[in-house]
Amino acid sequence: MIKNPKLLTKSFLRSFAILGGVGLVIHIAIYLTFPFYYIQLEGEKFNESARVFTEYLKTKTSDEIPSLLQSYSKSLTISAHLKRDIVDKRLPLVHDLDIKDGKLSNYIVMLDMSVSTADGKQVTVQFVHGVDVYKEAKNILLLYLPYTFLVTIAFSFVFSYFYTKRLLNPLFYISEVTSKMQDLDDNIRFDESRKDEVGEVGKQINGMYEHLLKVIHELESRNEQIVKLQNQKVSFVRGASHELKTPLASLRIILENMQHNIGDYKDHPKYIAKSINKIDQMSHLLEEVLESSKFQEWTECRETLTVKPVLVDILSRYQELAHSIGVTIENQLTDATRVVMSLRALDKVLTNLISNAIKYSDKNGRVIISEQDGYLSIKNTCAPLSDQELEHLFDIFYHSQIVTDKDESSGLGLYIVNNILESYQMDYSFLPYEHGMEFKISL
């Protein structure tokens, strides 16, 4: 998962430089300090060898010691001799050594050691290390350090490569996922099954991303509703203009004919009454237009309401109308029927539906309000509407044939009901049943 070679190369070189630098410093430190440690170690070995040999000489006679010292000096890099044999600080033995009192330089000199021989004599043996230990230590280092340094460099290279990949792969993974999140992909998420730090961070980012998507979807939904409302307003204004234009044109014709006393229009009282009726129709239409423009305000709040008390109040308003038509109203709702919407919106929906159910029921018909399987049901006995009428029934200012025959309704009622229910995202249907029509609203 290498998405950024430059970053990988840069991080690799940084890690390699650090490890290689540390390795170099360590090797330099070893080169500078090891000779002193080696001198100390050789000194301890030298002391131990001299002590052991001195103990061995105690078992020999004074005549045997010179030959033993000579053999000892030949087999080792240590010169051993009797101190009495030193003449002008030079020894005609195995080694010619320039010994400086009190200063060893590159040599290690053992102090005189007294030996009691087997024949009871007391002799002093002097041991001298005849090798440049400091130089020998450096030679040893120069023999091995180049190889160990190459091994260190190789290890640093391999370790830096795999360490950098292991370090950066989670970052590349985070970068890849967050880049897809920038495109608002609903299906992209961090793998929360990871047990490392990325898994923990991923859980937090997933939570934030899900909340962000939720907010964005809500905003998109609201924007769609706003666009829809704007389109509805345009259609509404056009429809309202058309609905007002027709009665105004009719009223103008009546008044002009009355002005010129043409035909029956000479009967002014009769046509003044008709003109007033036209004006009342336009006034009623304007009231409905103003009311329908407020449905957005009605749907801004939500509360849980019991439907029955609101319905009882509405039925009391239409009791006289129902009685005049001979329509029987059956309210089968209980106090358990509840809905989430504003009181004004609920009142407007039920008022329009109950009003239509009563107006367009058969003479001596029935209106039944009940709750069925989570739906509020309003049935009325009437002639079922055709499929063509049902298709356009919720369009603004639409008039079905039944409506036109019975009333001069504007057609705004069901349009308002449709908009309110859609604003609350409530499912609804208006379909024929065996005795008439049924309007159902999901609760």
From Swiss-Prot:
Knockout consequences: Expression of CbpA up-regulated at transcript and protein levels. However, another study shows that expression of CbpA is unaffected at protein level. Does not significantly alter nasopharyngeal colonization in mouse CD-1 strain intranasal infection model. However, significantly reduces numbers of bacteria found in the lung and blood at 96 h post-infection.
Residue ranges of domain Histidine kinase in the record: 239-443
Gene Ontology CC: one annotated term: plasma membrane
Alphabetized Gene3D superfamilies for the sequence: 1.10.287.130, 6.10.340.10, Histidine kinase-like ATPase, C-terminal domain
Presence of keyword ATP-binding: yes
Membrane-related topology note: Multi-pass membrane protein
Keyword Phosphoprotein: yes
Phosphohistidine sites (modified residues): 242
Catalytic activity of the protein: ATP + protein L-histidine = ADP + protein N-phospho-L-histidine
Transmembrane segments annotated in the record for this chain: 16-36, 140-160
EC number: 2.7.13.3
InterPro entries: Bact_Sensor_His_Kinase, HAMP_dom, HATPase_C_sf, His_kinase_dom, HisK_dim/P_dom, HisK_dim/P_sf
Domain of life: Bacteria
Compartments where found: Cell membrane
Keywords: ATP-binding, Cell membrane, Kinase, Membrane, Nucleotide-binding, Phosphoprotein, Transferase, Transmembrane, Transmembrane helix, Two-component regulatory system
Role, per record: Member of the two-component regulatory system HK06/RR06 involved in regulation of target genes, including choline-binding protein CbpA. Has been shown in one study to not be required for regulation of expression of choline-binding protein CbpA.
Miscellaneous comment text of the record: Probably part of an rr06-hk06 operon.
Protein name, UniProt field: Sensor histidine protein kinase HK06
Organism name: Streptococcus pneumoniae serotype 2 (strain D39 / NCTC 7466)
Taxonomic placement: Bacteria, Bacillati, Bacillota, Bacilli, Lactobacillales
Protein encoded by which gene: hk06
